Design a protein with these regions (language model features):
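Amphipathic alpha-helical coiled-coil segments
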Residues: 38-46
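Short, charged, amphipathic alpha-helical segments
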Residues: 26-37
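Short amphipathic alpha-helical heptad-repeat segments
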Residues: 2-16
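Flexible coil/linker segments and helix-coil junctions enriched in charged and small residues
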Residues: 13, 24-25
Length: 46
C-alpha cells in the first residue's frame, strides 16, 4: 500500500539522518530532517 511505501522511505531517511549526524554533515542532516517532517505529515494525513 502507499502507507507501506511511505513508511519504508521514512525508515530509510531516518537511517540517513543518523549517518549524516554521526559524520557531522549537518547541512545534509538538515535537508533529510526536513524531508522526514514532510513525510511524517503526509503519513499522518492518510
Amino acid at each position: 500500500s502507499q502507507e507501506d511505501i511511505l513508511l519504508g522511505e521514512l525508515a530509510r531517511l531516518q537511517t540517513m539522518l543518523a549517518k549524516y549526524e554521526h559524520d557531522e554533515n549537518y547541512e545534509k542532516a538538515a535537508i533529510v530532517a526536513n524531508k522526514i517532517k514532510w513525510l511524517e505529515n503526509k503519513i499522518s494525513k492518510l
